[in-house]
């Protein structure tokens, strides 16, 4: 598609956008365009309000805040799990808001990795986020297994994408567990989770997914697909705040499985304060909690998730696709002559919520964008990631970002910066 009047198109799309009013729910910095919601979502006024309410409960109630106040702390994780559940396609009792991404991965692998006989290996991929690999290596070492031999990583054919056929071919009779991303963090490719789950189960293998780059951005059906487990962060697309508590999903057929890592908050609620040294685990995903919840880190999620309950994930996905479609059209029209390559899937069914623009000068281009008050992120060695977020970005934002990129390239403004990443990229 070619747009003869791209700015007019952006204005028209914004005028027709049913989600446009939600932009006012967020703290947007004047003169700045935020395109990094796939790394850290912005603060909403509702998230700020529920954090302040929880602080007020602490101030006014002290320890009674566990059972009283605006948002009682004792069952806050369960309340948030119920709000998370529609976003991942799980039942409320299959979801728990607890831990962090990597802690939850440790918990789930400690629970579901049961090497026996020939099945002693974990299958992952070569493009996943490094922390997942570190955790899998650690879990193997704890079992006395050498990661060099027992961690199998499916290679990418082109450095961008994974082929499900290659993953399925690697599901051999020595694999005990599979852990894969829902969406690749660099290229934004969506894996076919339903197909991979079906193929894994046909071979007697349990499978789990890292949903950090998909939860809050695309619909899921973890329960219906039969996914064994999943885990994700709540600070990217869900706007829960830096380092906020993560989430996990455990399919109901695994209820009653003793968690690999146990702690008192995994107890059945009515038994927790019996203080018995024999644990009575919760009978659902709540059993996978370990310690006391980080209440002030949970609190912003109350307001943040209320927005998703109002809007619905399908509406978020529809606008996200429209934004990224528009951005790809502009990149094709305006930036290919400068050496930019679109490194994400173009097919809407395979594309997550961000664009992956490849360029040899990516690090310097990101710094030049920041000098123009555009916030992207950089992934070595050559990727500029841009994530127009449905709840707070506009089509005109997308137009402005591409226009600024064109100016940067026309005037070679990037040359004043070093082509190396910053400490936090």
Swiss-Prot record:
Tell me which residues bind pyridoxal 5'-phosphate. 101-102, 129-132, 210, 213, 235, 264, 292
Q: Which residues carry this modification: N6-(pyridoxal phosphate)lysine?
A: 236
Query: What EC number(s) are associated with this protein in UniProt?
Result: 3.7.1.3
Q: Name one GO molecular function term.
A: pyridoxal phosphate binding
Keyword terms: Hydrolase, Pyridine nucleotide biosynthesis, Pyridoxal phosphate
Recorded hits in Gene3D superfamilies, A to Z, give: Aspartate Aminotransferase, domain 1, Type I PLP-dependent aspartate aminotransferase-like (Major domain)
What the entry lists under InterPro entries is as follows:
Kynureninase (IPR010111), PyrdxlP-dep_Trfase (IPR015424), PyrdxlP-dep_Trfase_major (IPR015421), PyrdxlP-dep_Trfase_small (IPR015422)
Biological process, per Gene Ontology: anthranilate metabolic process; L-kynurenine catabolic process; L-tryptophan catabolic process to kynurenine; NAD biosynthetic process; quinolinate biosynthetic process
Which cofactor does the UniProt annotation name? pyridoxal 5'-phosphate
Which pathway does the database say it acts in? Amino-acid degradation; L-kynurenine degradation; L-alanine and anthranilate from L-kynurenine: step 1/1; Cofactor biosynthesis; NAD(+) biosynthesis; quinolinate from L-kynurenine: step 2/3
Q: Which reaction does it catalyse?
A: L-kynurenine + H2O = anthranilate + L-alanine + H(+); 3-hydroxy-L-kynurenine + H2O = 3-hydroxyanthranilate + L-alanine + H(+)
- Which Pfam family, an example, fits this chain? KYNU_C
What's an example GO cellular component term for this entry?
A: cytoplasm
What SUPFAM superfamilies is this protein classified in? PLP-dependent transferases
The UniProt similarity line reads:
Belongs to the kynureninase family.
Subunit annotation: Homodimer.
What is the role of this chain?
A: Catalyzes the cleavage of L-kynurenine (L-Kyn) and L-3-hydroxykynurenine (L-3OHKyn) into anthranilic acid (AA) and 3-hydroxyanthranilic acid (3-OHAA), respectively.
Q: What is this protein called?
A: Kynureninase
The species this protein belongs to is Exiguobacterium sibiricum (strain DSM 17290 / CCUG 55495 / CIP 109462 / JCM 13490 / 255-15)
Which gene does this sequence derive from? kynU
């Amino acid at each position: 598609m070619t747009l003869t009047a791209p700015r007019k198109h952006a204005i028209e799309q914004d005028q027709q956008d049913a989600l446009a009013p939600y932009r006012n729910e967020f703290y947007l910095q004047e003169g700045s365009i935020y395109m990094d919601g796939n790394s850290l979502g912005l603060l909403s006024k509702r998230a700020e309000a529920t954090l302040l309410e929880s602080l007020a409960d602490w101030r006014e109630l002290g320890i009674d805040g566990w059972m009283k106040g605006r948002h009682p702390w004792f069952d806050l994780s369960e309340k948030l799990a119920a709000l998370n559940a529609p976003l991942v396609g799980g039942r409320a009792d299959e979801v728990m808001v607890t831990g962090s991404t990597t802690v939850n991965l440790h918990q789930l692998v400690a629970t579901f990795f049961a090497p026996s006989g020939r099945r002693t290996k974990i299958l992952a991929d070569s493009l996943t986020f490094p922390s997942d690999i570190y955790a899998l290596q650690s879990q193997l070492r704890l079992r006395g297994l050498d990661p060099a031999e027992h961690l199998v990583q499916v290679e990418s054919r082109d450095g961008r994408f994974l082929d499900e056929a290659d993953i399925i071919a690697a599901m051999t009779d020595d694999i005990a567990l599979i852990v894969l991303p829902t969406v690749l963090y660099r290229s934004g490719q969506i894996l076919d989770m339903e197909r991979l789950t079906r193929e894994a189960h046909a071979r007697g293998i349990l499978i789990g997914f890292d949903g950090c780059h998909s939860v809050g951005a695309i619909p899921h059906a973890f329960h219906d697909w039969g996914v064994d487990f999943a885990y994700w962060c709540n600070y990217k697309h869900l706007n829960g705040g830096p380092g906020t508590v993560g989430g996990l999903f455990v399919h109901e057929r695994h209820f009653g499985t003793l968690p690999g890592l146990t702690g008192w908050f995994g107890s059945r609620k009515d038994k927790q304060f019996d203080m018995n040294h024999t644990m009575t685990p919760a009978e659902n995903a709540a059993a996978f909690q370990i310690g006391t919840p980080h209440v002030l880190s949970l609190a912003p999620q109350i307001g943040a998730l209320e927005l998703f309950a109002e809007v619905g994930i399908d509406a978020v996905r529809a606008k996200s696709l429209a934004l990224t479609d528009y951005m790809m059209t502009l990149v094709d029209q305006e930036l290919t002559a400068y050496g930019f390559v679109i490194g994400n899937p173009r097919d809407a069914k395979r594309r997550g919520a961000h664009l992956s623009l490849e360029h040899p000068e990516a690090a310097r281009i990101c710094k030049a964008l920041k000098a123009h008050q555009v916030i992207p992120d950089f992934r070595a060695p050559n990727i500029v990631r841009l994530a127009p977020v449905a709840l707070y970005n506009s089509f005109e934002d997308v137009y402005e970002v591409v226009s600024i990129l064109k100016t940067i390239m026309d005037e070679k403004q990037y040359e004043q910066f070093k082509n190396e990443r910053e400490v936090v990229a």
